[in-house]
């Protein structure tokens, strides 16, 4: 990733960094109308996810997670910024004239990619898991055949194919979870780009607010009506044996997954909290 440091004309540019290879494009038939965000509220207007709100208006980019242009080569034209995800996207021009957006694989610029059953194991190519050798690094993994990739789509995400037996393949996901998936499901070879997004300095708090992120306030400094840790005189303790969420549930490691989900039999090892 080519990081460009601006001239130190102000504190925000002095501490910020920009990827000079990423472009911005708002005139494209693959870009639809305004993408509405809930700002952390449910349909009744009650806060269900804190520290969200504001932010710039966004246009939605139609991403091709299915990769169903079989045996048709496409060339990566541009790497573009997508405000709806932390991974970059790239515009693909296929040989039949089709144009699509896909997640940008790491370290690919101006290369050709293809989807098929007997294509080379090359960064950016998509193929079924049954045609991949063990140990292949993959992303954009299907769970249901033909539905499109649903796993390992964030910036820097990468999974590993560790076993194949019968009709299933065993994958180690970025969270550390080990689970079974049908060998007929497809995935893309390589790692998602924009790996250093967590280490990137935004330069100023305004850049964070543009992304719809609000300040994080500790519950212990709130009022009792706002948080179970709130209230008291001065720097008072939380007043409970264990920390709690804003809704009174146990915090710090409580399992939130339902105990009777259909996919429990497919998960060989749970992710670590």
From Swiss-Prot:
GO cellular component annotations of the record: chloroplast; mitochondrial large ribosomal subunit
Gene3D superfamilies in the record: 2.30.30.30, Nucleic acid-binding proteins, Ribosomal protein L2, domain 3
Subcellular location: Plastid, Chloroplast
Keyword Plastid on entry: yes
Keywords for the protein's UniProt record, in alphabetical order: Chloroplast, Plastid, Ribonucleoprotein, Ribosomal protein
Biased composition (Polar residues): 1-31
PROSITE patterns associated with the record: RIBOSOMAL_L2
Renumbered residue ranges of the record's region Disordered: 1-53, 222-273
Gene Ontology biological-process entries: mitochondrial translation
Primary location: plastid
Protein origin, superkingdom: Eukaryota
Gene Ontology molecular function terms on file: rRNA binding; structural constituent of ribosome; transferase activity
SMART domains given in the database record: Ribosomal_L2 (SM01383), Ribosomal_L2_C (SM01382)
Keyword Transferase (UniProt): no
Assembly and interaction partners: Part of the 50S ribosomal subunit.
PANTHER family assigned to the protein according to its UniProt record, in alphabetical order: LARGE RIBOSOMAL SUBUNIT PROTEIN UL2M (PTHR13691:SF5), RIBOSOMAL PROTEIN L2 (PTHR13691)
Similarity comment: family membership: Belongs to the universal ribosomal protein uL2 family.
Listed name of the protein: Large ribosomal subunit protein uL2c
Lineage: Eukaryota, Viridiplantae, Streptophyta, Embryophyta, Tracheophyta
């Amino acid at each position: 990733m080519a990081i460009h440091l601006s001239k130190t004309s102000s504190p925000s540019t002095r501490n910020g960094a920009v990827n000079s290879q990423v472009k911005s494009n708002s005139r494209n038939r693959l870009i639809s109308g305004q993408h509405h965000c809930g700002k952390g509220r449910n349909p009744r207007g009650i806060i269900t996810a804190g520290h969200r709100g504001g932010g710039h208006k966004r246009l939605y980019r139609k991403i091709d997670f299915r990769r169903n242009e079989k045996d048709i080569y496409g060339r990566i034209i541009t790497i573009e910024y997508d405000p709806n995800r932390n991974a970059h996207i790239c515009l693909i021009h296929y040989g039949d004239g089709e144009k699509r957006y896909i997640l940008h694989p790491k370290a690919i610029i101006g290369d050709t990619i293809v989807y098929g059953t007997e294509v080379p194991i090359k960064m950016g190519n998509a193929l079924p898991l049954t045609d991949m050798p063990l140990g292949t690094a993959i992303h954009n993994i299907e769970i249901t055949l033909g539905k499109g990739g649903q796993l390992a789509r964030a910036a820097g995400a990468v999974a590993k194919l560790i076993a194949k037996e019968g009709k299933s393949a065993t994958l180690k996901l970025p969270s550390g979870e080990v689970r079974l998936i049908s060998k007929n499901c497809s995935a893309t070879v390589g790692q998602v780009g924009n790996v250093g997004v967590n280490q990137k300095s935004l330069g100023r708090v305004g850049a964070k607010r543009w992304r719809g992120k609000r300040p994080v306030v500790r519950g212990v400094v709130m009022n009792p009506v706002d948080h179970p840790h709130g209230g008291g005189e001065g720097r008072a303790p939380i007043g409970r044996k264990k920390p709690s969420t804003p809704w009174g549930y146990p915090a710090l490691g409580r399992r939130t997954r339902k105990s009777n989900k259909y996919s429990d039999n497919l998960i060989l090892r749970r992710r670590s909290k």
